């Protein structure tokens, strides 16, 4: 399938990290400019493009043409699609292929794909030869608005999501909104959960705009570019203030403590996409916030109503086979949440809501309260 690309004027968002600052270039039709942008940053570099089998069929040839057209030498590394590649075996494969391709420290890795490819390729770049620069070319909505920005890279452990990794900032992000036309409706919806997250954590006006325009984002063009750019600006500002997640950056994990546990409980097998887990997790976080007297019940209903209107799952029972594999066991979910990256001295850290657009970090929620909360949610779910 060939997607026609009608170029729009690109939007540039700066991630301000001093000497390690970089641009996020957003727009419909910006992919063909990738080669000249990279050549300006690293003239003469050899470039290894890491992608997955699905993305390769749509965008690898065009990406390589842009790179070679700018005088760059390329090689390709193609991995299997999905979370199965975000593993010890997956990163070993990519590292060995980079070494075989003789990628040196002054060369580049290009991550062409969604969140899995970006995390995997970025982590491999971080550790091969003790660090090779890389460029993110995100091809999913989730990657364009979240995982490609901020330098978090890594893989999953059998014990949990994203437990092995490194902070390794890209030197450039090129987000062509036209490539999102090749996503399945389910993949696009999963990415939309991360867009809604930005409204929930700090921008009620953006959330209200999304309630009106979420269908226009699916259609594309100006609404889609606005949503991606607004999300990237929000994340870039937080990353600039708290690169290593010592404080404010934790707000970006709204819904992720619950969501990552749900993903782990399904075995990262594709029954629950990351964004779908985040959607359910954000509703659970809002409901827990209401139980703690922090947010009005009307706001919780508004959040769930919007996510459901966008076609996202919002309840545990929305997960296929949710009564299997620990999904219907509050104690099993608590065990998985105990492996969350935000755990400090054995205590869970939750991102909770005081209102739509007002998120807070909380480390003083009693585990027994969370366990009872989950048990009630499971008991209320139909068999």
From Swiss-Prot:
UniProt keyword terms in alphabetical order: Amino-acid biosynthesis, Aromatic amino acid biosynthesis, Cobalt, Cytoplasm, Lyase, Metal-binding, NAD, Nucleotide-binding, Zinc
Residues noted as binding Zn(2+) in the record, renumbered to the chain: 194, 256, 274
Gene3D superfamilies according to UniProt: 3.40.50.1970, Dehydroquinate synthase-like - alpha domain (1.20.1090.10)
Residues annotated to bind NAD(+): 81-86, 115-119, 139-140, 152, 161
Disulfide linkage: none
Catalyzed chemical reaction(s): 7-phospho-2-dehydro-3-deoxy-D-arabino-heptonate = 3-dehydroquinate + phosphate
Cofactor stoichiometry and binding remark: Binds 1 divalent metal cation per subunit. Can use either Co(2+) or Zn(2+).
UniProt-listed GO biological process terms: amino acid biosynthetic process; aromatic amino acid family biosynthetic process; chorismate biosynthetic process
Metabolic or biological pathway, per its Swiss-Prot or TrEMBL entry: Metabolic intermediate biosynthesis; chorismate biosynthesis; chorismate from D-erythrose 4-phosphate and phosphoenolpyruvate: step 2/7
Compartments reported by the entry: Cytoplasm
A single Gene Ontology CC term: cytoplasm
tRNA processing keyword on record: no
NCBIfam families with a match to the protein in the record: aroB
Record family assignment: Belongs to the sugar phosphate cyclases superfamily. Dehydroquinate synthase family.
Protein role: Catalyzes the conversion of 3-deoxy-D-arabino-heptulosonate 7-phosphate (DAHP) to dehydroquinate (DHQ).
Record-given protein name: 3-dehydroquinate synthase
Lineage summary: Bacteria, Pseudomonadati, Pseudomonadota, Alphaproteobacteria, Hyphomicrobiales
Gene: aroB
């Amino acid at each position: 399938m060939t997607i026609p690309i009608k170029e729009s004027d690109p939007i540039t968002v700066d991630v301000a990290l001093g000497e390690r600052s970089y641009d996020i270039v957003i727009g419909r039709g910006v992919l063909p400019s990738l080669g000249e942008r990279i050549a300006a940053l690293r003239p003469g570099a050899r470039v290894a493009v890491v992608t997955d089998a699905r993305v390769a069929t749509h965008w690898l040839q065009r990406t390589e043409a842009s790179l070679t057209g700018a005088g760059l030498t390329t090689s390709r590394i193609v991995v299997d699609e999905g979370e199965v590649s975000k593993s010890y075996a997956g990163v070993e494969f990519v590292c060995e292929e980079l070494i075989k391709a003789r990628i040196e420290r002054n060369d580049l890795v290009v991550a062409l794909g969604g969140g899995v490819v970006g995390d995997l390729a970025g982590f491999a770049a971080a550790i091969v030869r003790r660090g090779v620069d890389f460029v993110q070319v995100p091809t999913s909505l989730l990657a364009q608005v979240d995982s490609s920005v901020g330098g978090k890279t890594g893989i999953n452990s059998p014990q949990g999501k994203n437990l092995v990794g490194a902070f390794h900032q890209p030197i450039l992000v090129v987000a062509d909104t036209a490539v999102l036309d090749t996503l399945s409706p389910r993949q696009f919806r999963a990415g939309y959960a991360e867009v809604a997250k930005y409204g929930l954590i700090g921008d009620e006006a953006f959330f209200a705009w999304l309630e009106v325009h979420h269908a226009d984002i699916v259609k594309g063009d100006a609404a889609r570019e606005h949503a991606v750019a607004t999300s990237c600006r929000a994340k870039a500002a937080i990353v600039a203030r708290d690169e290593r997640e010592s404080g404010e950056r934790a707000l970006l994990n709204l819904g992720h403590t619950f969501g990552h546990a749900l993903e782990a409980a399904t075995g990262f097998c594709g029954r629950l996409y990351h964004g779908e887990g985040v959607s359910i997790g954000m509703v659970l976080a809002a409901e827990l916030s209401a139980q703690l007297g922090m947010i009005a019940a009307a706001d919780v209903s508004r959040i769930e109503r919007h996510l459901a209107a966008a076609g996202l799952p919002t309840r545990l029972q929305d997960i296929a086979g949710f009564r299997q594999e620990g999904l219907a066991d509050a104690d099993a979910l608590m065990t998985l949440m105990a492996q969350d990256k935000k755990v400090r001295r054995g205590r869970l850290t939750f991102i909770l809501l005081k209102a739509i657009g007002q998120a807070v970090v909380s480390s003083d929620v009693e585990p027994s309260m969370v366990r009872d909360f989950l048990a009630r949610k499971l008991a209320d779910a139909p068999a």
